[in-house]
Swiss-Prot record:
Database matches in CDD domains: M3A_MIP (cd06457)
Name of the protein in question: Mitochondrial intermediate peptidase
EC number(s) given by UniProt: 3.4.24.59
Organism of derivation: Aspergillus fumigatus (strain CBS 144.89 / FGSC A1163 / CEA10)
Catalytic activity: Release of an N-terminal octapeptide as second stage of processing of some proteins imported into the mitochondrion
Transmembrane segments: none
Amino acid sequence: MKDQLLVPLRRRPWTCQKCLQRLQLPRHQTRRSFETAASPFPRPLDSLPADYARTKTVDDDTLRRVFDSQQFWREFSQQRAAQPKPTGLVQNQYLTSPDGFRTFANVSLQKCQAIVSKVLAASTLEEYRTMARDLDRLSDLLCRVIDLSDFIRVIHPDPQVQEAATQAYALMFEYMNVLNTTTGLNDQLKKAAANPEVTSQWSDEEKIVAQILIKDFSNSAIHMPPHERQRFVNLSNDISQLGSSFVNGAEPAKSHVSVATNNLRGLDPILVQQIKRWNRTAAVPTTGMIPRLALRSVHDENVRREVYLASRTSSKRQLHRLEELLLKRAELAKLSGYESFAHMTLSDKMAKSPEAVSNFLTALVESNRKLVREELSQLQVMKGAPLQPWDHAYYVHQRVLQYSQARRSRELSAVPEFFSLGTVMQGLSRLFDRLYGVRLVPQEPAPGETWNPDVRRLDVVDEAGRHIAVIYCDLFSRPNKHPNPAHFTLRCSREISAEEVAECASLDQSSHPNDGMATAVDPVTQTLRQLPTIALVCDFPEPGTNGGGRPSLLSEHSVRTLFHEMGHAVHSILGQTRLQSISGTRCATDFAELPSVLMEHFATAPSVLALYARHWRTDEPLSEGMIRSMERDRTAHGSIYGAVENEAQILMALVDQAYHSRPADGGRIDSTALYQQVSQQHSSLPEPADATTPPTSWQGFFGHLYGYGATYYSYIFDRAIANKLWVDVFGAGRHAVDRAAGERYKNEVLRWGGGRSGWECVAGALGSANESNADGRLVEGGDQAMREVGRWGLGRDGVSG
């Protein structure tokens, strides 16, 4: 596999990035008549949909209880335990045992090979007219195996299943790399796209998908002569290996700083005992939690300075890895005909160019600067002397303590009592019901359907009772589970053609056109659709095991995290396009975080809190006084550190651009000099630059330089847009549960997936009368549009508690 083409630049031609991401509900009580392939198309008995006749009220109550009561969940989840034949993982008919992964991959591989043969042999107009759809199906078949196997090999507790999933992943990934070098596919697609008699019959979606694939082929060196293509392959593999080494090899130049223990006053004495040595000194480590706590709490400024400098200075070996990575990327861009790696990476993003990103970030620095000065001036008054970078965490902590002692409401400590996981899930369902007319319905999992007994299955239904998506919620902590919250698209939405159904029926009586996973018949077109299947993973504490035990109670931060991941989910669920390559979150990298960041605003809006925030034991709603206290607390925290945190993110994005915008013939890269240059030019608390202090090299710890090379600006870009939509579409919370606002956002943004320019989505949501969109300045994007978004700013983001 190492000799095949690896393309770490952007979405590969035959797979799309998994954003780690979505959901919805109805208004009047209705009997759900679940429309699926069960009637018109053959499917195994064990994958038939369960009873959907439960009322909306019962569903709503059940939703809360399946997450809050372990006893209720055990009883609820055992209702299908007697089913004689096990269902495969996530209803996939092949995955009833570890060996099933091999079968699943081989069956999918055979279907892929048949499509490739068809495309390569195409010669008639009719054959060329189906090409975009054929290649989209090829992409779907690859993603079916790669995305699901990649998820299962990480999340499943059984090593045998992990290994089987890894082998299936490797098989299809290697085949994908073979396709990347199959020049005939590129030639045939370009021939189809150049023929007006073909493209005149294509839908807008087919045209978009064709252009995406052509661009991806171009970025995969498919058009190069053999010797250049081999060089491209070698560079891509080098970048992959260097990137992995860079991410995993972060290390400081010094492992610890030696400090006299009596100079560590302020640090937790228990921690001091842990690092204390025999000679009345302590070895303060330069990585991990202890140096962060030292910067926040040690009273001695000289100690803080020493810890700060050491913890932000990378080893020479790590800096060499980074600089080699940047050189290889620049060379790859030059080989591909681009001025720089940033030019190559940004060409299909909303930003389009490094210059536009620079305009955005520069405007953002200016819009944020006044707030930064306000925050730093307050800290400087506390210190009574010029503020240094190693002072910031310390004096922020002091201010937070002062605020907590003087003004923070004691009742805020009780807020998590109103945020049981079940009530929050109930609130999300009710919110989606009001905004989009979709809701979440707990469903009993079939035997073998989930990878752990604690995984809850939710079906998403619309107001007509139609099933539109499946969500697997793996939200509780357990040993060896990855702690980071994430959203995974296990299967994208897509229209399944009648030809596929017929092909499936001819192969095997038990075969299913969506591998047994969820499908439904579109009531308008009467075509079969594969439904989006999503996994949400979090690490919340488990509820009590007895019947009256405490449920999992969430902090405000955890509530916002769950809303964030559900924002990704709602994009997947409502962005149901006919072709999978542009469904849901399969959009430009600098647009993908918009729905999730916007969802965070809803979490603490008073009208949304009224939907769900109730005491887990008494069912008493969160009082208006407590809601006001939470808002004051958030505002206070934001005014203490929010703008400086914004500036830190902006600086990281500027460093990323500085590294990746250098021309390929620029020679060796001094990453530390560039980092220091950005810091001195844009930071309000720049790194020390005096001759007696060696320059810091924090860039060696900036692992996102690999995974988000040239696109690190995306998150703050989407934050600026989300803030704007929150104010101008949802009235800063006044219309947070308003159907008209929800429909506007759904119809202009969510439903398109990646089938519409992000700029068109934003402009459509704001409307032509919006001052920021005067003269249609946003629709076409470009430098001025990026600068306009920068002027919107990021505000201040604080978290209560």
